[in-house]
């Protein structure tokens, strides 16, 4: 008899009173996700399994009895879609944080690692998270790259790669299908990817930003079953009515009041509403929380606490096909959270497999890295750069006027056109404009750096550089001064990746991320401190204007699968037409000026 079968047999015996429980939790108020009730009950646990949920005081036979003193007992919280890499922590350090907050299971789309390392990146995700107390369900990334032909990442995934990964038992489905255009227009690659998911019988996650009407229906017809890219309350309702599981995410908090108000108009809240974090940086994760912070926001905006908790427990378990999770019921896994109040959720105690793992925000036992797993390093294949590499030039004209296409906006980008002066072939930056610069870092082609004008970010006072840039994670630098841009970029090349700020010839802040150019090997608290410092100091370089022009927008400046213009390692791209666009519209030569001032690009 297997060990699991033995535990189940012991649980049956304990439930019948034929043998004692291993652990008996008494004086609890059960948050019943099946009925919506809050009711007094005791919970008997055998091994990692709940054996019995029974009236208070009806059983006393247990090897250990622990009183919850009237605390609210909930199933462990679940995050149905997360890019764990956004925490910039390896899996064991990430687990140490979220477990103390009550998150006991996550569905991890490691497409950031996959875009750098290919299948080996997904293998690292599986191996590094296999024996964690956190239940980590890994997905097979479908977006490597997210937009073929418009960008080049470290690998290319199609049907064969998906079949390989979906054959691993630890891989639970197809990660968010971002190439909406390819799905809707029947690209061979996307048909292979989605069909591999359908053949596996596993989940197929969606990314349906902006889809509506016939296109939304077509996207579902292809086999996609969820979406976390909600843009409004109306969008959420349309997708719910269409049959998608909607995943309300915490990374767009400004949408939550309207989404909650819309949900409260419905006569029934179905099981097809879950919650996810998607992306949470380390300082926010440590100081405010992941799923727990999102649930508290939903409650603040008027959603009943039991409904919010159901989204993160029973609904999530149904979505993720984890029928051993999501309920406090006999036969389910004893991953449990104790709250003192449902008005503001704070995890008092966290149990994993029936063992007390965390109390009052503190982990009782450190989590060791997976044995025999070597984190991938040395992934920035770029030689040191010079200031001259960061100059925007116009071919075919020495002195004159050029009309250029450019990127407008920080998050939802639009096309713009502007006339600029050209001196010695170099564009003179207009007032209110900055530069965006991208260079391929995976060693798959030797293309020259791409550079374009950026409007809507103000006049950056220095430079911001990152090797964590959705979704191909090439090296990206924003700025106006070529010397500062080179300084920030070279800092990252030397450290193996990360983020850096430069101003007036000095590095203002730097967070090294030597693991795949996106993860740190620092303790979580120290990484959070460094990241917070970089975020705070970034306001010396950029004038932030929430909700769109924010620090987080740096990471999405090259996300070519979204509508509008974006700059990638292959050039200026258009998300609608799926074309690479020449930024030069027209130019004309004029007599050479007699006044040769220093050019505003800082070279």
From Swiss-Prot:
It is an enzyme of class 3 (hydrolase). It catalyses: adenine + H2O + H(+) = hypoxanthine + NH4(+). GO terms for molecular function: adenine deaminase activity. Keywords: Hydrolase, Manganese. Its EC number is 3.5.4.2. Pfam families: Adenine_deam_C (PF13382), Amidohydro_1 (PF01979). InterPro entries: Adenine_deam, Adenine_deam_C, Amidohydro-rel, Metal-dep_hydrolase_composite, Metal_Hydrolase. Its cofactor is Mn(2+). One of its GO terms (biological process) is adenine catabolic process. Belongs to the metallo-dependent hydrolases superfamily. Adenine deaminase family. Homodimer. This is Adenine deaminase. It comes from Klebsiella pneumoniae subsp. pneumoniae (strain ATCC 700721 / MGH 78578).
